[in-house]
């Protein structure tokens, strides 16, 4: 497939703000692909393969600027200045290509496969001379591409394609292009257990729907973890759960999948990125702890004080993420315990459709607790007083609260789903919301007075998981230290968009738009009806949405979450209804 066809389609996608039109363009593009369909899918995602393979070009913006300088005889400083103004290195590459006089003497045919192969060479290049090899590979693409093509190729390399599509949009288009839409839910479930859109598209194109429907948990392939709904009281949870359920500590750590197969261990984050090399102590301990042929375990990695055993908050674990050196030293200074609470696969058996209580018994039977692996603390109860005591113990032990889990016969493990089989109960913030919110930054407003020179407020949005859009819910200007406040322009410069991104639904016009990328944790006073914001628009009142009143940044950037993992508009709507219900009860 010629990349010129892809670039033309990308240009049309980038210019539309209509979701249905965007999906139709994507469907038509997928249908034009041949055997290179999986490669096209990966490029659409701004990747070279599924996340769990961890393939990256190692081509930074700085290196691209260096290559563009070589190609154009324009200084790196000058290109960097233009990049700072534009906020998109792809646009800069296009502008330089339009002015170039040099082209490759032997023109390569720019196909999807050729581009993917070239980017894979970048990714696999190591050792001395690897930087030059990557620059040379980029130069090859630059000299053989049209200006439009190099713009999109450069964006693919940086992982910021800027055409307003997500995995959900791509999956929807794959189903429309290659399958009967009656299988849509089943295909989504398969993707949640096997998050490789390239593979799924390829099999569906061949007509292998049965192979896709059989997909389930597989050792060494991470899945999208199960998530919890939220309620604000023990009594509400027990009522929702039929009077009795299990309650587990909700640990403040990093969600971690532990995969074991024939003595080999791999760890994955909730974003399906491999973290094995960052936690060699946990990897080694897993090999020694679990005497099984194969298993997939779900848990929370939590840092702790080696002297007192006290649990540290989530932020401390960031000192270990991404490190390549001194890991042994850091491992001893900041040891990790993985608190396990579920098992979805054991010795060739898929346990995802086994009830929760049986899964828990199986989990308890396969290992002896140690400093590295422990069971999440748990009780089963229908007594509110007992649960309240357990909740207080969780807070005292440094946890966020509790997760209630259904013990019904159909309490299956539902990958990627947020449902009422699991319900979280976090610390009561008194007059504030009873839980924090994870919101995506979609815009910013310039600061004035003391905040001149930085952003005075950020525009935050919830995720509408039905429409695959981001809906504004508040302007945030509180909770920032001066250091964080004045670092905001630098933090967000790579996400700047010249116009409102297609997936953002907003009535407000900020000074700067951002592509949805950064998630931050926020607390607020209450949820209110808003004629300005678009979250859950029209659900409570016509021509009005919902907003967070008096939002405040908690100080926690949710780097472990993708924008699509943000608090959903539906959750905000449920919180508003619960809030109204509580106020009514208090008045009566």
Curated annotation (Swiss-Prot):
Catalytic residues (positions): 250
EC numbers listed for it are 6.5.1.1
Organism superkingdom: Archaea
What does the organism's lineage look like at the top? Archaea, Methanobacteriati, Thermoplasmatota, Thermoplasmata, Thermoplasmatales
The cysteines joined by S-S bonds are none
- Cell cycle as UniProt keyword: yes
Q: What is this protein called?
A: DNA ligase
The broad enzyme category this protein falls into is: ligase
Kindly give the NCBIfam families that the UniProt entry links to this protein: dnl1
HAMAP family from the entry?
DNA_ligase
| Single GO BP term | lagging strand elongation
CC cofactor: Mg(2+)
Task: Extract one GO molecular function annotation from the record.
Answer: ATP binding
Instruction: Report the protein's function.
Output: DNA ligase that seals nicks in double-stranded DNA during DNA replication, DNA recombination and DNA repair.
Q: Which InterPro entries match?
A: ATP-dep_DNA_ligase, DNA_ligae_ATP-dep_bac/arc, DNA_ligase_ATP-dep, DNA_ligase_ATP-dep_C, DNA_ligase_ATP-dep_cent, DNA_ligase_ATP-dep_CS, DNA_ligase_ATP-dep_N, DNA_ligase_N_sf
- GN (gene name): lig
Per the similarity annotation, which family is this? Belongs to the ATP-dependent DNA ligase family.
Catalyses: ATP + (deoxyribonucleotide)n-3'-hydroxyl + 5'-phospho-(deoxyribonucleotide)m = (deoxyribonucleotide)n+m + AMP + diphosphate
Matches recorded under PANTHER family: DNA LIGASE 1, DNA LIGASE 1/3 FAMILY MEMBER
* Residues reported to bind ATP: 248, 255, 270, 300, 341, 418, 424
């Amino acid at each position: 497939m010629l990349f010129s066809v892809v670039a033309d389609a990308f240009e049309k996608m980038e210019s539309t703000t209509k979701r249905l039109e965007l999906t139709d363009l994507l469907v038509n593009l997928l249908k034009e692909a041949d055997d290179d369909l999986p490669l096209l899918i990966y490029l659409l995602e701004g990747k070279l393969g599924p996340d769990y393979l961890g393939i990256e070009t190692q081509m930074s913006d700085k290196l691209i600027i260096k290559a563009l300088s070589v190609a154009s005889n324009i200084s790196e400083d000058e290109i960097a200045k233009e990049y700072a103004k534009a906020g998109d290195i792809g646009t800069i590459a296009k502008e330089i290509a339009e002015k170039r006089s040099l082209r490759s003497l032997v023109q390569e045919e720019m196909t999807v496969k050729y581009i993917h192969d070239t980017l894979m060479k970048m990714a696999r290049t190591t050792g001395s001379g690897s930087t030059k090899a990557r620059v040379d590979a980029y130069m090859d693409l630059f000299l053989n591409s049209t200006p439009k093509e190099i713009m999109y190729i450069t964006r693919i390399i940086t992982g910021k394609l800027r055409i307003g599509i997500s995995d959900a949009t791509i999956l929807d288009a794959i189903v429309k292009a290659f399958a009967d839409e009656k299988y849509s839910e089943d295909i989504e479930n398969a993707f949640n257990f096997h998050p490789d859109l390239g593979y799924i598209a390829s099999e569906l194109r061949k007509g292998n729907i049965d192979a896709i429907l059989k997909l389930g948990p597989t050792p060494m392939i991470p899945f999208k973890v199960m998530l919890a709904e939220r309620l604000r009281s023990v009594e509400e949870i027990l009522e929702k759960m039929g009077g009795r359920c299990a309650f587990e500590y909700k640990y403040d750590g990093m969600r971690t999948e532990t995969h074991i197969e024939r003595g080999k261990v791999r760890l994955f984050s909730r974003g399906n990125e491999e973290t094995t090399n960052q936690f060699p102590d946990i990897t080694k301990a897993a090999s020694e702890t679990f005497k099984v042929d194969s298993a997939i375990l779900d848990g929370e990695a939590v840092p702790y004080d080696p002297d007192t055993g006290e649990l540290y908050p989530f932020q401390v674990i960031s000192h270990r993420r991404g490190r390549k050196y001194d890991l042994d030293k850091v491992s001893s200074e900041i040891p990790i315990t993985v608190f396990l609470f579920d098992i979805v696969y054991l010795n060739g058996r898929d346990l995802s459709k086994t009830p929760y209580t049986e899964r828990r018994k199986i989990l308890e039977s396969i290992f002896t607790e140690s400093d590295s692996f422990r069971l999440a603390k748990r009780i089963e109860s229908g007594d509110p007083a007992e649960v309240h005591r357990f909740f207080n113990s969780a807070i005292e032990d440094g946890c966020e609260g509790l997760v209630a889990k259904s013990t019904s016969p159909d309490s299956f493990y539902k990958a990627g789903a947020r449902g009422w089989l699991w319900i979280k109960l976090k610390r009561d913030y008194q007059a504030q919301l009873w839980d924090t919110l994870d919101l995506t930054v979609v815009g910013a407003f310039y600061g004035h007075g003391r905040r001149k020179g930085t952003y005075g407020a950020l525009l935050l949005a919830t995720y509408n998981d039905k429409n695959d859009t981001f809906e504004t819910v508040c302007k945030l200007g509180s909770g920032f230290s001066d250091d964080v406040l004045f670092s905001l322009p630098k933090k967000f410069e790579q996400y700047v968009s010249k116009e409102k991104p297609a997936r953002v639904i907003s009535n407000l016009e900020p000074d700067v738009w951002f592509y949805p990328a950064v998630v931050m944790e926020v607390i607020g006073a209450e949820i209110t009806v808003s004629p300005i914001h678009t979250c859950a628009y029209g659900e409570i009142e016509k021509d009005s949405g919902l907003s967070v009143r008096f939002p405040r940044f908690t100080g926690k950037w949710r780097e472990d979450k993708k924008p699509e993992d943000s608090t959903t508009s539906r959750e905000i709507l449920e919180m508003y209804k619960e809030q109204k219900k509580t106020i009514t009860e208090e008045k009566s």
